[in-house]
Amino acid sequence: MNRRKFLSYIGCGCSSLMINGCSTAPITDRRQLKIIPESNLNAKAAIIYEKVKEKEKMSDDKKMLNEIKDIGKRMENSISKYFSETGKDDPTTNFDWEYILIENKKIKNAWCMPGGKIAIYTGILDITKNNNGLASVMGHEIAHAVAKHSVERASRGML
C-alpha cells in the first residue's frame, strides 16, 4: 500500500470517528467527543463508588448528611426543571443520585462521579461554613457530571 492511500484511510477513519463520536454538551451546546458510552462509564463509576464507601470512614453526622441530601435533592429538581422548561433532553435522567459524607478533616474536597455519585469530605465543611457555601461546592461538582466532562475526558484518553 502506498503512503498516499494509507494516509487517506487514516483520514477517513479519523473523520468517521469525529463525526460519530461528537455530541453536544448540555446547556452550552459546545461540541464534545464521546466515544465511550455513558452507560459504561456510569456502571464503572457505581462500582468505584461502592469501593470508596467500603474503604473510607463514613461520617456519623446524620444531621449534616441529611442537609447534604436535601441540598442535592433541590439541585436535582432544579436541573430537571431547567431542562424541562428549555425543551432540552435532561442528561441526568439515567442518574442514580447518591450522597455520602466521608469523615476526613484533612481532605478539603468534594467530587461527583458520572451517574450522580457524590462525596463530600468533612474537611471542606470548615471552608464552606454554611449550607450556601456547601451548595456552591456541590453545584460545581454536579455541573461536571451534568456536562458529561468525565465521558469527554475518558473519550479523549482513548485517542
Where are the predicted features?
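A Zn2+-metalloprotease active-site environment signal
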Residues: 2-159
